[in-house]
């Protein structure tokens, strides 16, 4: 996808895969040539898993359309929700493709590690009606559940920040309110 985190790691060998097709080409090359071209490769890091699924959706739509283009009454899919007959079957096929590729890497002797983005999601407890926030992944829960079920460990990093509002001295001439900015007081 459009992640460039590898730029900040000294000595890392990285292959930018901005399309899912490129991801498949790179991983297939590693799988096919592990012993000859990549004998010391131990792990592939996917930065980020949510971006991988984002670039995978248009790939799956195109693949689905190519596979069915000559069929009578076929209406090309424009989104993943329309692919594979709808009802989340497009997402399920994309999950299958991603998981199969990760399994092939593992069988070739290459582990995988992925990073992802997190977000805060507000929920209401069904019994008490209380609202609460939880930290979760910034991707479809369907995709996350599939990856979570194939992972040995999942960690979520969270930074607890204390914020304060500070006046910066500028006053709005109409409302007479001073302009404020938010500053980080502490992080842990």
Segments from the language model and where they lie:
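Glycine-rich, flexible loop segments associated with nucleotide phosphate handling
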Residues: 38-43, 85-88, 175-187
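Phosphate-binding/switch region of NTP-binding enzymes
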Residues: 112-188
């Amino acid at each position: 996808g459009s992640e460039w985190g590898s730029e900040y790691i000294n000595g890392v060998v990285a292959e930018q895969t901005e399309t899912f097709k490129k991801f498949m080409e790179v991983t297939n090359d590693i799988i096919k040539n592990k012993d000859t071209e990549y004998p010391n490769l131990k792990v592939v890091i996917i930065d980020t898993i949510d971006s991988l699924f984002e670039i995978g959706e248009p790939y799956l739509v195109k693949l689905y359309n190519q596979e069915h283009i000559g069929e009578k009454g076929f209406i090309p899919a424009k989104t993943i929700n329309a692919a594979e007959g709808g009802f989340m079957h497009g997402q399920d096929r994309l999950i299958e493709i991603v998981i199969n590729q990760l399994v092939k890497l593992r069988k070739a002797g290459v582990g995988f590690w992925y990073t992802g983005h997190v977000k805060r999601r507000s929920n209401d407890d069904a019994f008490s009606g209380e609202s609460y926030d939880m930290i979760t992944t910034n991707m479809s829960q369907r995709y996350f559940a599939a990856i979570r079920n194939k992972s040995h460990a999942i960690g979520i990093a969270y930074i607890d920040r204390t914020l304060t509002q500070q006046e910066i001295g500028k006053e709005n001439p109409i409302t007479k309110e001073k302009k404020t900015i938010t500053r980080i007081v502490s992080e842990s």
